[in-house]
Amino acid sequence: MKKILSILIAFSLINTANAVTRITCIGASITYGATLPDPATQSYPAQLQKLLGEKYSVSNFGVSSATLLRKGDLSYWNTKAYQQALQSKPDVVFVDLGGNDAKLINRVHLGEYEKDYHDLIQSFAQLPSHPRIVLLLPIPSFQADTNHIYDKTIVNSIIPKLRNVAYNEHLEVIDMHSMFVNHESWMPDKIHPNLEGTAMTAKRLYDIIVQPHDKTFDVFSRMNQQFKETDFYGYPCAGFTFDNRDCKVVKPKWAAKGHPWVWRARFWGHEPQTDIALLEHGFHIVYCDVAELLGNNEAIGYWDDFYKMLTNAGLGKKAVLEGMSRGGIYLYNWAAVNPNKVACTYADNALLDLKYWPDSAILKKDFNLTYAGQIGSLKVSPIDKVGQIVKGNFPMLHLSADDDEAVDPSKNTLLFEQKVKELGGSITVIHKPGFKHHPHSLPNPAPIVEFILKATGYAIPFPN
């Protein structure tokens, strides 16, 4: 009996060691690899297989021209590939459907898009393998013909509906649209990626598969706050009052190890593409409204309390600080007092010297001034605190619109950069030639996201 038991245990260990993670990719022509010289080896599922190696099995069930809609002109529901995908015993399912639904012939049925998507998801969720399901936003269409795949329909209808589905189904969603929006050269026919585009898609999906998760961490249950949950671009957002200030915490679908987080200093939800991208990587996004205290001691005190509450709830000890415009005042004044609690900063067309703040009444109130001109002598601006800031040894990223009419770069970002470098600090400035104060950020936030991932230790290199 002992011999039989030993054999069974050994067999079990061999099977476990040889276990292969099955990844099923469903979609239309982009998944299939249409227009590529050799779809069998160059489609993004094929390239994903090469990146992941022999411990994974990636299957391509893409069907050219297929729609998510049941009533579409070529519905994925009616294809043999769909049935094969259901029978593939998947551990992970990537769903890349929605572009063809933006054709004129299919738009009449878009009212049924969410229902059809929910049903498709359930058909996989109910499989015995209970796969992880990841939804991909459609990439852009650069076609001008509104009868065909039309990008305005993708942006204004398909993507919001898809995010609603992701929120209601508690599923991950990956923003492929932003990743391609500034890379028309990757799409020679305006709708299908070339080899470079499919390679970047494969790498993005590779990152999702291999990044370590903390599946059990839930910051909402650990904050000890009464909150109202809302939908932040497909992610759960807790809104609550803390120290009589309006606060928000958005949690990712899964937390990265170490529970990293981004602290938005001001203008919640404005140009959110960086925040959304980092949520995809397992970061949390938080906000504590201290407008309009302009980074004074009262504001710093509120933020100190907020930081303590969040870190006690399990978020990492160092925050990524993000500030647009006068948000730069808030983030750097807090960083000057708390340099060892900062992982890195991202400041965008940032106001860094309160001498150039236009509202004298607020300035006098916040800093107890007789007249606004006294602000310079108080040395209460980030431009005056560079020595304290660089003590944190954290990297800083600034976006600077060269033609900014609201915040003069020469008196703010560029002077700040000079002072940081003189004191041995680490700062990178991305210039935006010809741009004014708005818009902030970048349509494709990849340079910002890559900077933050590298600074926090979450960047995933290409495998050897």
What are these regions (language model features)?
Residues T21-C25, I30-H118:
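Conserved SGNH/GDSL esterase-like catalytic core that processes O-acyl groups on lipids
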Residues L36, I139-D214:
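Catalytic His-Asp segment of secreted/periplasmic serine-dependent ester chemistry enzymes
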Residues L74-W77, N333-I375:
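Hydrolase active-site cap/lid region
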Residues D96-N100, S123-N156:
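Active-site segments of SGNH/GDSL-like serine hydrolases
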Residues P188-I191, L195-K203, V210, V250, ...:
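C-terminal catalytic histidine-bearing segment of alpha/beta-hydrolase fold enzymes
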Residues L294-G314, N333:
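Alpha/beta-hydrolase active-site loop
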Residues G314-S325:
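Alpha/beta-hydrolase fold nucleophile elbow
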Residues Y356-E422:
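The feature captures the conserved acid-bearing segment of alpha/beta-hydrolase catalytic domains
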